[in-house]
Amino acid sequence: MEAIANLHDPLSGVVVVLLADFLRQHQGWGWLRLVAGATPYKEVPGLTMVKVMGSGHGGGFSLRPSATHQGLICTFTHLDLALQFLDSPAVQAYRSRARECWSGVMAVQSARGHWDKQAWQASSAQSLGETGQDAAQAPGPFAVLTRASIVPTKAMAFWRYAPAAQADLDQSPGCLLAMGLGEAPLVRQCTFSLWQDQQAMREYAFQGSHQTAITAAYKNDFFSESLFVHMQVLGMSGQWMGKDFGDDLGMDAVQTKLAANSSEQEAAHV
């Protein structure tokens, strides 16, 4: 794993997310992944960050932990290295042991905040390859990653808002996928969600129970650190919660999407 030279320099590159719901006979294998953490990935080319995380019951936001659900979030210096990882034995090991597994590669459009004192920034043209431009607004599937370190003495106050926010998320018509993740029980939490477009995400984020929870979090200083990341989905593969998301994680498919998005952005400025 490539070292980050300076924590004061924002982390830039391409994001990979993998979600797994392990078969019962492979729960032990999944547990060992959590125990090992980042250690097995130290030699992965281009990898700059990796988080192996558990989840709440059913893959949701419950205080009750799931014995089968798990998530992997990684950042890479370059798109081709991210795709190489998604085709590696390490990822195939997850897929072969899972009842359902979803994986995706994404370009960061915008980011605010920090994760382990490290800021993030938009994916550069260099990280996306020769046909890529700096990540910008684009049509199609849109992903959101949020994470927070919750002040321990305020954890229970924060969690009182979770059930209503999840209920609204489950009922949101534009949400294609959502999973609650955690680095540590109660106090280091993360959410990954996939949306049909940005408008659908905004309709959920800025009204109802979610807006109430966010307002309370800032008013009461629930977080000691937080990060909010908006991402363009470049490719995804697998099944989740009974939905089939296809398989377009090949380099040709991803580069075709990047080229199409670049053409649409150029046309919009004519």
Feature annotation, model-predicted:
Residues T75-T77, V91:
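Aromatic- and glycine-enriched beta-alpha-beta binding-site module
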Residues R188-T215, D221-F222:
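Glycine/small-residue-rich hydrophobic helix-like segments
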Residues M1-H69, L79-F85, R99-V187, A200-F206, ...:
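Short S/T/G/P-rich N-terminal loop/turn motif that feeds into the first structured element of a domain
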